[in-house]
């Protein structure tokens, strides 16, 4: 054990000269491995008297601890130097553009709904909603639609049973609103509606917006003025607009509204009319005192006309190439 101090000094010198972690590990094995110089010193204890062995073992362990501490310190130095060298080599060009984060956008039909709600909100209309699973009273009977009307046929309506169905229009919201509150009433009712049809211009589910005003002294002139302002605001053009006589069971007189397209042809955009007296009576409103007008329009239809979309089904196919056009 007389040369123990020399072994420690030799180990520390080798540690300080190690140029990388691999070389340092070789030094560790040489001095502290199973057959290392300091490890083998423990075998000399058997040559000592029993009473001297504990003190001698403590001295050897102290020497090993000094070498281990030197190894740890040098390893930290080498790892730090390697990290600094790697960071210096891996320079970052801060002038390069970053990765672009894709922002989402509103669906074109949602944009149309928001635009219409904003316009009518400025006119004092509030948004009303109702159930999509409706009963035949609110969807048909209260709206003056008789039992023999084609809309009640199985091929046009999704029926659950004899009285429950997927609503074919949001007009049921008007009925529920008129039964729940007295005039004056001024609402719009956006929502999903369902009809058994599917082709280039029809889908089984689509979005509809209906409007309703009930008050005293409401006339067809009020209806025409409101819809003129709305259509010119929505399309952002001084459109040529015409009201064409039509028939709806729940309005009298009734009309369909057309706008002149860029191709010189009339395009139907919505239906409207004065609320039928029978509808007012069905909800407990006196038609001798109050009158009103109502209108309804398909959101997909208006969106197609506004953005020049030719196939209604494009709105439901989730094709990002199509949807990104409307950001």
Swiss-Prot record:
Q: What domain of life does the UniProt record list for this protein's source? A: Bacteria
Query: Which Gene Ontology cellular component terms are annotated?
Result: cytoplasm
Query: So what does this thing catalyse?
Result: tRNA(Phe) + L-phenylalanine + ATP = L-phenylalanyl-tRNA(Phe) + AMP + diphosphate + H(+)
- Keyword DNA damage listed: no
> Does the keyword field hold Amino-acid biosynthesis?
no
Top EC group: ligase
Q: What is its main location?
A: cytoplasm
Which proteins does it associate with, and in what oligomeric form?
A: Tetramer of two alpha and two beta subunits.
According to UniProt, the name of this protein is: Phenylalanine--tRNA ligase alpha subunit
Q: Which organism is it from?
A: Shigella dysenteriae serotype 1 (strain Sd197)
